Amino acid sequence: MQNSSRHQQKKRNKKPGPELPLALWIHIAESINGDSSWYITMRLQQMMWGKRGNKLQYKNEDREYENWEITSWGWKMHLRRVKQWIQDNRRGSPWQYKVGGTWKSIGVWFLQAGDYRKVDRHFWWAWRILICSCRKEKFDIREFMRGRHRWDLCKSCAQGEVVKHTRTKSLERLVLLQMVEQHVFQVLPLWRARRSSTTDFPWCRDTTGYTHAWSVQECWLMEYLLEDE
């Protein structure tokens, strides 16, 4: 009797989980209805990304900046936090990354209404590839076409290697991207994309590359602007 009453007490004290927006419930229902393996696939992807991947590393700092970097085989990105922009309420956007020889702010909040999803697109494209643990090394176009190196990479990293080693809008890039199109896309949960050593790391406004793949057209026009020194 005592165990039974204790069980009932626990049941009464049980708190409901977080309330999700109706639109999200509709999306979940439609996804499950369309593919019975949807939930299992998402859980496996989350477990996979919880264990693997590269992380942002603190390097050093001076009076004005904290310097950070992330590396993934032949890829490297330099980032910094502007100290005077760091706020106590954690709502600031102090992050910048080095692109094309200049420092560009990311995660900036805009006061005017509008569609800002594509503002930091180049950063999130490169970030998706950098946090992935695929072995991005020894790229050779002939070997890539034979499939020797290509199938060691996930779809996002394979697209990234093509963009890095070919010219924008070239026929060579288009042919290689068409070959990569056969790869199975690996979903990367957005919580993993934002996992960082600091609380003010920016939110991803565009889910391209994380919940769905970049198109051939988008990669064909993409410029590689990182500095890998």
From Swiss-Prot:
Keyword Hydrolase tagged: no
Pfam families the record matches: Lenti_VIF_2 (PF07401)
InterPro entries: Lenti_VIF_2
Predominant location category: host cell
Keywords recorded for this protein, A-Z: Host cytoplasm, Virion
One of the record's GO cellular component terms: host cell cytoplasm
Superkingdom to which the source organism belongs: Viruses
Localisation per UniProt entry: Host cytoplasm; Virion
Function: Determines virus infectivity.
Protein name per the record: Virion infectivity factor
Source species: Caprine arthritis encephalitis virus (strain Cork)
